[in-house]
């Protein structure tokens, strides 16, 4: 059974104390979570040559705040919403009304403000529960929301996140975690040697503003095909393909084969990331219809991050469980709508292991 301890992490610019909660299991896996933004600060995985911290991040509270309040916020390790990913022209309609959101990513709305909230915490057994509210009108969204994020670390080295939301008005919800994974143990170098597997026959192409076009395309015969695992470096620089050229890497949603008839099968692997250096693997499971794969295309800015390291471009991979981007404006896609009396429920699990590559390790 996992143990949970805590320690002070820092103070926000508004004077609020921030606490770091550390979950550890008997096998040596350790996960650190902050009550600011529900940030995953560290995931330390035992490996043959010693423990490896497999997520990017910052050393201080001030660094996280400077990042998250900048125009180029990375949301590094954070819980994001109300609507993870982009909403076209920062507008959508629900309940017969049209809502204008903050346009914080060019003309579009991206992610929202949940990464900048302070959460109330309860710890019991091997579980950490973080709760907060989102008032009606926050970022322009309707409805008063009650948020609950539950973190669980199991003895088989699975780290699971469960999200639950209720609303008192018709609204939309799409939540995810924005951790940046580098399984190599050296985030001072590119991570494109990591292997990726995606259980997905289709993806949603995006335009030059990273907005989904409304199409669903087959991955067959394109650099988007990860049904047979391969190193990212084999395809990430293929600028003859417009999707990679526009994004300077991968920043796309894949339509998971594990989601059928309106339900996700979280007993089946939807994605695997693996390092040929440390032999650390990550197997992902979710009930969501999509996964956003982002390869750190906007990293390499020269900003010093965790341990003073300046991360290069393509140093990491985000695997973000989600509804498809801009689903509120794409009526044929899986629904992001939430009504009063209903419960939004989403979860994702990352299972860590070591050894040679395998899909069902």
Predicted stretch roles:
Residues 2-361:
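An exposed, glycine/acidic-rich loop-and-rim segment of catalytic or binding clefts
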């Amino acid at each position: 059974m996992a143990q949970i301890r805590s320690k002070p992490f820092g103070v926000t610019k508004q004077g609020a104390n921030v606490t770091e909660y550390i979950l550890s299991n008997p096998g040596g896996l350790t996960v650190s979570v902050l009550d600011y933004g529900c940030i995953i600060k560290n995931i330390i995985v035992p490996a043959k040559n010693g423990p490896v911290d497999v997520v990017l991040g910052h050393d201080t509270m001030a660094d996280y705040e400077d990042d998250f309040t900048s125009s180029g916020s990375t949301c590094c390790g954070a819980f994001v919403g109300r609507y993870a990913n982009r909403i076209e022209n920062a507008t959508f309609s629900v309940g017969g009304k049209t809502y204008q959101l903050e346009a914080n990513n060019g003309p579009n709305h991206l992610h929202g403000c949940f990464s900048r909230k302070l959460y109330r915490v309860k710890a019991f057994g091997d579980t950490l529960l973080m709760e907060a509210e989102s008032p009606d009108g926050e970022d322009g969204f309707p409805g008063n929301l009650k948020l609950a994020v539950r973190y669980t670390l199991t003895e088989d080295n699975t780290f699971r996140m469960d999200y639950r939301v209720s609303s008192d008005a018709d609204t939309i919800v799409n939540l995810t975690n924005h951790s940046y994974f580098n399984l190599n143990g050296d985030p001072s170098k590119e991570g494109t040697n990591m292997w990726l597997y995606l259980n997905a026959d289709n993806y949603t192409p995006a335009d030059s503003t990273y907005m989904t076009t409304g199409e669903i395309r087959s991955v067959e015969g394109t650099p988007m095909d990860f049904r047979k695992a391969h190193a990212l470096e084999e395809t990430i620089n293929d600028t003859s393909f417009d999707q990679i050229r526009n994004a300077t890497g991968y920043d796309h949603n894949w339509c998971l084969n594990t989601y059928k008839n309106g339900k996700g099968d979280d007993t089946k692997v939807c994605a695997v990331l693996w390092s040929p250096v440390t032999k650390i693997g990550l197997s992902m499971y979710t009930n969501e219809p999509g996964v956003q794969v982002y390869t750190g295309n906007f990293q390499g800015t020269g900003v010093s991050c965790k341990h003073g390291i300046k991360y290069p471009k393509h140093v990491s991979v985000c695997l973000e469980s989600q509804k498809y981007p801009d689903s509120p404006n794409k009526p044929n896609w899986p629904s992001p709508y939430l009504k009063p009396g209903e419960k939004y429920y989403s979860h994702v699990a990352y299972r860590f292991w070591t050894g040679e590559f395998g899909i069902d390790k």
